[in-house]
Design a protein with these regions (language model features):
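Solvent-exposed loop/turn segments connecting transmembrane beta-strands
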Residues: 234-240
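Transmembrane beta-strand segments that form the barrel wall of outer-membrane beta-barrel proteins
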Residues: 224-233, 273-275
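Residue-level recognition of beta-strand termini and adjacent short loop/turns
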Residues: 4, 93-95, 151-153, 219, ...
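Feature captures outer-membrane beta-barrel proteins of Gram-negative bacteria and organelles
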Residues: 244-252
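Structured alpha-helical segments in the cores of large, soluble enzyme domains
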Residues: 208-218
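Long hydrophobic segments that form regular secondary structure
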Residues: 91, 95-96, 214, 317, ...
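Surface-exposed loop/interface segments of Gram-negative outer-membrane beta-barrel transport/assembly proteins
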Residues: 2-83, 101-208, 235, 254-321, ...
């Protein structure tokens, strides 16, 4: 929406809710429902004559692996997923040809799941189970840019932009599994006799970037551009957070030259060259840190142990690439 002649503001928000029923596991194993279905022979009927599911218990299931449909019914996994995505922006033009824009985005997700394993189902060996989990994810992003463009003598076109971007990501949750439930109706956590597994993962990272770009073209014939940026990531060592990257490019639009006007069958002809560096930070969030983990027992006492050796020298992966291209067009669309 236009607040006044030099300011525009806007927002966009989306909310979704899903309920998903699925099998408990997708591993490549005969007991996993999805995998087991690939090994079913055509004459293995998953249903009895009365329409109910064929079971190993009464011998109605003739397959050598589990009946995938019966497995899913007796080991149900339900998920509830909430998703909120919202963006707000403000764009100002305080003077002619200058545009200043600020945008804030929030991406939030909440997922809960409930898994049950019914003890009456023979493949479960009269041993029930229950698992509950809950996870939250919040990703915040802010982008600020200032763009200035102008022309000189109707043939020199300039476009300059500087900006900053920040990302803050946080994820946390918990998961608890208990075993030993003896009744199909009471397959909740508190009905189990033992807690077989549990966890409460937390992970987060942040990025901060500053960048600039310049573009110039002369009479739509000669083009030049450059860009520089500095990126900081929490995934690297204390003295290795930052990486600097750049690129330059040139392009000659041959089709605009007078000596090319006679070639009517050639609708486009451009020669381009660019060179520069780019960075990659795709590693685990805490790869650079020495880590310890709990859950170990020493003489029946809770203990911790080293789970990862740190490396403070981890830094950005940098790639330098150069490209030369010839663009030709033969059809005028």
């Amino acid at each position: 929406a236009k607040a006044n002649k030099w300011l525009k503001i806007g927002t966009n928000t989306m909310f979704t809710y899903q309920e998903v029923e699925q099998s408990d596991d997708g591993e490549y194993a005969l007991w996993a429902p999805i995998s087991a279905s690939f090994f079913m022979l055509p004459y293995w009927n998953p249903y009895k004559e009365d329409g109910s599911l064929a079971l190993q218990d009464d011998g109605s299931w003739k397959g050598t692996t589990e009946n995938p449909l019966a497995w899913m019914e007796n080991n149900p996994l339900s998920n509830k997923k909430y998703k909120l995505l919202s963006t707000f922006y403000a764009e100002a033009t305080p003077i002619k040809n200058l545009t200043i824009r600020s945008q804030l985005s929030a991406d939030y997700g909440h997922t809960t799941s409930f898994y049950r394993s019914f003890p009456s189902y023979k493949p479960n060996n009269n041993y029930g189970g229950a698992q509950r989990s809950s996870y939250d994810m919040l990703n915040l992003m802010i982008t600020n840019t200032a763009n200035y463009r102008f022309m000189l003598n109707d043939v020199h076109s300039f476009n300059f932009m500087v900006g900053q971007e920040g990302v803050d990501y946080h994820y946390e949750g918990f998961q608890v599994t208990t075993r030993g439930q003896t009744n199909d109706i009471l397959t909740n956590l508190s009905s189990g006799s033992t807690a077989s597994s549990w966890g409460d993962p937390v992970t987060e990272y942040s990025f901060l970037s500053f960048f600039g770009r310049g573009e110039y073209n002369y009479d739509d014939r000669y083009y030049a551009d450059f860009s520089v940026r500095g990126d900081g990531s929490s995934r690297f060592g204390t003295d290795k957070h930052w990486g600097a990257f750049w690129s330059v490019g040139f392009m000659w639009n041959l089709r605009k030259e007078k000596f090319m006007q006679k070639y009517k069958w050639l609708t486009n002809a451009q020669i381009a060259i660019n060179t520069g560096t780019s960075g990659n930070s795709s590693i685990n969030n805490y790869e650079h840190l020495a880590l310890v983990s709990g859950g170990y027992k020493y003489n029946n006492e809770s203990g911790i142990a080293i789970s990862q050796l740190g490396n403070e020298e981890l830094s950005w992966e940098s790639t330098w690439a150069t490209n030369v291209a010839l663009h030709l067009g033969f059809i005028d669309r």
